[in-house]
Regions:
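Short, charged/polar, Gly/Pro-enriched secondary-structure boundary elements
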Residues: 38-44, 76
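Minor-groove-contacting beta-hairpin "wing" of winged helix-turn-helix DNA-binding domains
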Residues: 28-35
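Hydrophobic alpha-helical interaction segments
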Residues: 95-174
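Alpha-helix boundary/capping detector
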Residues: 41-42, 57, 167-168
Length: 174
């Protein structure tokens, strides 16, 4: 994943604190042992997970770069939802610097327009693109704000995506 050793260690500590049964020691390494019901594990751990989005830029132009879809746009690519009029992209902090989003957007007044051309979510970690050039489904779900997740249509499609990715309650581990 390209995460620092300390970050990975901290993540394992937090997972072990939430549910000690899913983290096992193999010598000096710690590994995940999710068990048969991945959906149950997700439901147990998801409230403790934070959004992967560090910051968000609402831009008046679409960046000229290859960055994966993120947030609602990524979820729409995996489901029957219709996307917002503007796409949402997921970028790394390095891409944010390369695209000069942090400084240029504020200085030029390009950030935060009422009707943006796109939204760029800067993620706390390197996004792993899923097929179709979108972030992975679980990151897409976690990056949605609470008001979008509470929408009944979005909540229903989140359930459908989770069932496909993690398997239904009755299907166990895939």
């Amino acid at each position: 994943l390209g995460a620092a050793k300390m970050t990975a260690s901290r993540a394992f500590d937090e997972l072990a604190a939430a549910d000690p049964s899913i983290v096992a020691a193999e010598g000096r390494r710690r590994v995940l042992r999710p068990g048969r019901d991945k959906m149950a594990m997700w439901r147990h751990l998801e409230p403790r997970m934070s959004s992967p989005v560090a910051r968000e830029h609402r831009l008046g132009r679409v960046p000229d770069a290859e960055i994966p879809l993120g947030g609602l746009s990524a979820l729409c690519g995996l489901s029957m939802l219709q996307d917002d009029p503007w796409p949402t992209f997921a970028a790394t902090k390095a891409q944010e610097r390369t695209l000069k989003l942090a400084a240029d957007a504020r200085d030029a007044g390009l950030d935060e327009p009422e009707d943006p051309a796109c939204v760029v979510q800067v993620l706390r970690y390197e996004p792993v693109p899923a097929p179709g050039c979108a972030v992975d489904p679980l990151s897409a779900i976690l990056s949605l704000p609470a008001d979008e997740r509470d929408d009944p249509r979005v909540a229903g499609e989140i359930e459908n995506v989770l069932t496909r990715v993690l398997g239904g309650d009755h299907e166990g581990n895939r």
